[in-house]
Amino acid sequence: MNYVDLTAYDMLEIFSKLQSHSSFDRLAPTWTPRLSKIKEILGSFNVEYKVKHYIVPGFENRYFTNLYISFNTESNEDGLLFLAHHDINNEMSENCQDNTSSVCHILEMIKTLKDKELDRPIHFAIVDSEEHVNFNCCGSQVLSEDIHNGEFGNLEVCVNLELTGLGKHIWVSSFEKFPDSCQKTIERLNAHKVSTPFNDAYVLSIHDVPAMCIGILDDEDLEIAVNSYGYPRIWGLCHSLEDTFDKISKEDMATFQQTLLSICS
């Protein structure tokens, strides 16, 4: 199948119908159906990627896997790194908000930027085992080691995508405080600062990598999140059978995709 003409929304519809393995399945294959589909899509884009396998204690019978893609690495400018976790908690759910919509945004960005002249290095990481909620043994922790080892050169900030399928309002969160290097990007996004549950940006921050998390909310959920009235309804879909494709907005995803591309320049 040729995926070149598909948007993030189109790819999300494909993933929503794909049965795969939970991140907690100790006997899952290295290349789960979800990860194999990502690999297939990247192949369709004719994009080179690096595979990083790693072991999680307690899950020694399987490998977990990060995928890395980089563009314009010859530039001396500080780069941006976008990431999203591809693993899932509930294999019976369509997992559209958590977190396949974000993976599909990453894939569309890769498709769009691969042949563009870029002003700075742009990197992508599609990471594993976020659902384990472990600051010291997950895909983003492995990513932090690779960042410190120079895999991606100098980075201005890492932008973690979560819950990006519905809403016109952009939110951002960070662990304890936003790194100074995030401020320019936050201003360009006109984003609302909120508090969120555990995510990969928190892991990166704990390991001394400048990072923030970004997503979108509708009017009602934005008010809840900004004013700390409770838990936004959209976030409550995570891990549930209600996290379905019919709750996703094609228009909102398209708008958010353009916003993501705008901060790459």
Predicted segments — roles?
Residues 1-32, 39, 87, 161-163, ...:
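N-terminal capping segment at the start of a domain
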Residues 5, 9, 25-36, 96-104, ...:
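Soluble non-cytosolic domains of exported or imported proteins
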Residues 10-72:
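A non-catalytic alpha/beta surface segment that caps or lines the substrate-entry region
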Residues 68, 81-83, 123-126, 156-161, ...:
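Structural recognition of the beta-strand scaffold that forms the well-ordered cores
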Residues 73-79:
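Proline/glycine-enriched tight loop/beta-turn segments at coil->beta junctions
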Residues 211-229:
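Short, solvent-exposed beta-strand-terminating loops
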Residues 223-265:
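His/Asp/Glu-rich mid-to-C-terminal helical/loop segments that flank catalytic regions of hydrolases
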